[in-house]
Amino acid sequence: MPVLSRQLLFSIAISFPVIASATNGMNMEGYGPISLGMGGTSMAFDNGVAAVMNNPATLSLMPEKKRLDVALGMLGPDVESSAGGVSAGSDGDAYYMPAVGWAKHYGEWTVGMGMFAQGGMGTDFSGNSFMGNPAQSAISPVLENRSELSVGRIVLPLTYNAGNNWHFGATIDFVWAGLDLKMAMSENQFADMANPASQQAGRTSGSLVDSFGAMYEPFGGTGVRSLDYAYFDYSNSSDYSGKARGNGFGGKLGFVYEVEKGFNIGASYHAKTWLNDLETDDANMQMAVNIDTGVAGGGAPSGSYVDSLIPLSGKMTVKDFQWPAVLALGVSKQVSERWQVAADIKRIQWADVMKNFTMVFNADNVASNGGFAGKEMTATLFQNWEDQDVIALGTAYQVTDELVLRFGANLSDNPVPDQYLSALFPAVTEDHYTAGFGYDFSQSDMVNFAISRAPEVSFTSASGITSTHSQTSWQLMFSRLW
């Protein structure tokens, strides 16, 4: 097989949109409609080429010699944030993601390739919402607050039927990630992050912060009486990729053991990713300040103040964003000729990768950036997510030779601590309830569909912003077997 270069893989990858919402934290609750319809269970039974995102060893259970799956999914989050008696709804309410996978048996071996959305999260609040003007300042900014994090994979699986009812599988994954962010911060947030004696929600440092601190009168400086807001902006209008991008690799291992006819045990391990930093050379930052007119003109303080914007251009780097390791164990039992039940338990190790969200802004060394030209700022938002345990339960009933019905539940806790909950990253959905069906048009052509509903949950951050989140999602897949 020809070796695809890292650059070619990335070019292919960004031509596919990937999701930006939250299910099990940022992970999807089910990959492929067969799994999703059964509550996200997938460790111990054949669930199509989506096995490359679940337990690759189940590809070895595929009864046909070759299989092609083509799928489309939609995630429909319903997110609202409120504070002080006002509320705002997110306009990001539908995210579509295609997927494709192919697998083929070669004797005891199975190979293939798949391209799937991994997960993400995001919101989109209008500039006309209460979030669009953090200080309710004289400057009317109408700031859009938007986040869209998306992660996808191209997966190359290899499985082996070792005999004696044992099946083993592994994958090599090319992983890409993209992030759009438009985020307004109030003066109180900035002061908390910049003051070493405070830093309850995050911290900021660097030569740019030092230069601003020398002007910021609440910190003993001269020239800036107040900061109405600071605004980070690196976002594009593409449905296919984020403004800040990175890529790297991951991998999975799995096994299935057929205890007896119709009763399987399976397990998998998804390794933590090795992604490089997400970067864009086209980022912007602006600060709305009440500044001394003399200082603003490059001279001595005049004692007269005016509202003004300080726009900066530069490079933004999101440091060390990774996807977590996942451990999963499951069973599947064919209770009767037509009735199957399955159960999985999964641990998603968010604590290892979501301790902090760190951005580094390097201002361009150009005249338009004034005294901040060439300066650097590191901003860290504390996250401190907890590891998440997920229990998936599912059942399938073969109504006729052509039609199978599926039902399931996916049960978990919110991994995001209330103290650090952000309206832009409300990955707080917990339980999901699912249903689906499969229909065989012939021995070689079939369709599978699943729908998932996450009831509304509500959490309030330490800053007093309440986020509510419910979600409806579906997946549709057409398959050809031969």
Enumerate the predicted regions with their spans.
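Residue-level signal for pocket-adjacent positions within structured domains
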Residues: 21-23, 33-40, 47-48, 54
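Transmembrane beta-strand segments of Gram-negative outer membrane beta-barrel proteins
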Residues: 27-42, 60-78
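A short glycine/small-residue-enriched secondary-structure motif
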Residues: 68-83, 87, 119, 128-136, ...
